[in-house]
């Protein structure tokens, strides 16, 4: 396979304008050699410190594959340690996930960063290392039986890291350095778990080109699920090491990139901290990363011996940027879709309790269901398709097939309600699942929800009606990024009176609250 290096250069030149923000880095490795390396903008606008290829940036959730790689390289067979998972979930009432299911995001557990919102956290408050395990230990149920579906969950990897450190008797930073950073030549990479103290004093920025940029104030401690800081030079060395060890079936990357599957045998799209997807017509493994003020993405196409890395110190889409580099280098053009017609609307999934919303534009559809919106194009057969998702209609029912999640949803139409009286649902509610409360206040047509729990009393969030007895709670900023976004809140009635609520988002579904 030959790369169009001129087209790649043009695509790299376009990144600062297409993905506007304070700064960023991007690089490409082909056949084990660095063929492109760029750094633009500033690591700190106020101090005028330029962004450089040696500037260390948080790679955030890209760290998950490093955790899984060290796990396999030190402990080997994960099944030998499955019994230890129970130590971290003492109140769990269903089948417990295995260690492998944690690594593959098939545990069915709710994401603990999403749950920090429901436990009363404010986006910028300090979240210490010792705050995580008590929150996880409160879990009593999950989304689904382990191994049957996919759900992104950061606490999976926090549990993995705790078991890994306990079994080896060694700190995770030392294991990273010994097993991956050293062999890969990642000379400056390190675990920087405390986000209040970023490596090289790099500043991440919230905001946008429309409203301006302001420094993100992060206060979380994460380990196992994220926390590594690395420069572009470090990350390109990692990609070169992957290529150099490609023929060794016992190499770390070969082992973590084996095709994953669900317990039923159906192929899965995520395993050992790696996403398996198709980008620009290529099968790739990789991962994204996010913290307020930062975005990162890496892709590796093993058959083509091609890798791409993009990291921003702002919140533009690193996934889209990295995808554009692959497309340019390969001369790939995405197929044009037919004009959509009659797909717009909203539906409610009775199983997850989540709202599905579909919007139309000239180029396709935007589906809002999971953490971020999915873009779909309508094929010649009239079927809207996107990355790992497609839509169909059975009468008024909307059928969503999320093959990457091993999930089929049959959602019923939800009539639109623009104005509703929140006075009926105002009051205090308690969730046994979380051992936490939800307070709703209504005044002069406005409605707001506040969460109280293990981490305090959080800010009041906006509450908007969307359908009969269905509301959305809007969370645009949280400890982790991206924020949960819109939570679907359903009213539960007994004899016509409000008895409780069911709240959920893609990362934390089906949480029941009883009226106090």
Curated annotation (Swiss-Prot):
Signal peptide: none annotated. Keywords: Aminopeptidase, Hydrolase, Protease. It holds the Pfam family DAP_B. One of its GO terms (biological process) is proteolysis. GO terms for molecular function: aminopeptidase activity. NCBIfam families: PRK13128.1. Belongs to the peptidase S12 family. Homodimer. This is D-aminopeptidase.
């Amino acid at each position: 396979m030959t790369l169009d290096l001129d087209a790649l250069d043009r695509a790299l030149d376009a990144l600062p304008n297409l993905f506007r923000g304070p700064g960023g880095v991007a690089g490409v490795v082909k056949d084990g050699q660095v063929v492109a390396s760029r750094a633009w903008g500033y690591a700190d606008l106020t101090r005028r410190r330029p962004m450089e290829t040696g500037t260390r940036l948080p790679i955030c959730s890209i760290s998950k594959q490093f955790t899984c790689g060290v796990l396999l390289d030190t402990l080997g067979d994960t099944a030998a340690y499955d019994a230890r998972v129970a130590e971290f979930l003492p109140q769990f009432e269903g089948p417990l996930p295995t260690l492998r299911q944690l690594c593959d995001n098939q545990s069915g557990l709710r994401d603990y960063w999403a749950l920090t919102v429901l436990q009363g956290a404010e986006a910028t408050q300090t979240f210490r290392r010792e705050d995580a395990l008590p929150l996880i230990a409160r879990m009593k149920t999950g989304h689904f039986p382990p191994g049957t579906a996919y759900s992104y969950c950061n606490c999976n990897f926090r549990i993995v890291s705790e078991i890994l450190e306990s079994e080896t008797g060694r700190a995770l930073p030392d294991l990273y350095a010994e097993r991956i950073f050293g062999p890969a030549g990642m000379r400056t990479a390190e675990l920087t778990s405390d986000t209040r103290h970023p490596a090289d004093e790099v500043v991440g920025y919230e905001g946008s080109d429309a409203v301006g940029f302001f420094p993100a104030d992060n206060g979380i401690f994460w380990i196992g699920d994220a926390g590594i800081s690395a420069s572009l030079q470090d990350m390109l060395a990692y990609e070169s090491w992957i290529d150099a060890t490609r023929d060794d079936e016992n190499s770390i990357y070969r082992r973590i990139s084996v095709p994953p599957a669900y317990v039923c045998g159906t192929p899965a799209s995520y395993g050992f901290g790696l996403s398996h997807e198709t980008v620009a017509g290529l099968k790739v493994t990789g991962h994204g990363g996010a913290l307020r003020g930062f975005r990162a993405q890496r892709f590796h196409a093993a058959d083509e011996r091609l890798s791409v890395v993009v990291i921003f110190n702002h919140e533009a889409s690193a996934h889209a940027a990295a995808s554009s580099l692959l497309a340019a280098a390969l001369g790939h053009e995405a197929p044009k879709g037919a004009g959509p017609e009659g797909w717009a609307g909203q539906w409610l999934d009775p199983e997850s309790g989540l709202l599905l919303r579909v919007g139309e534009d000239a180029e396709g559809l935007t589906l809002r269901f999971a953490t971020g919106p999915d873009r779909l194009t309508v094929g010649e057969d009239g079927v809207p398709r996107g990355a790992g998702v497609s839509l169909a209609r059975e009468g008024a029912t909307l059928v969503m097939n999320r093959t990457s999640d091993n999930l089929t949803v049959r959602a019923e139409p939800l009539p639109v309600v623009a104005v509703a009286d929140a006075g009926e649902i105002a009051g205090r509610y308690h969730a046994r699942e979380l051992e936490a409360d939800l307070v709703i206040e209504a005044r002069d047509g406005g409605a707001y929800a506040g969460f109280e729990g293990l981490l305090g009393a959080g800010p009041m969030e906006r509450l908007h009606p969307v359908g009969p007895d269905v509301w959305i709670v809007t969370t645009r900023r949280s400890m982790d990024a991206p924020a949960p976004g819109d939570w679907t809140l359903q009213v539960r009635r007994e004899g016509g009176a409000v008895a409780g609520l069911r709240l959920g988002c893609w990362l934390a579904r089906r949480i029941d609250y009883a009226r106090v």
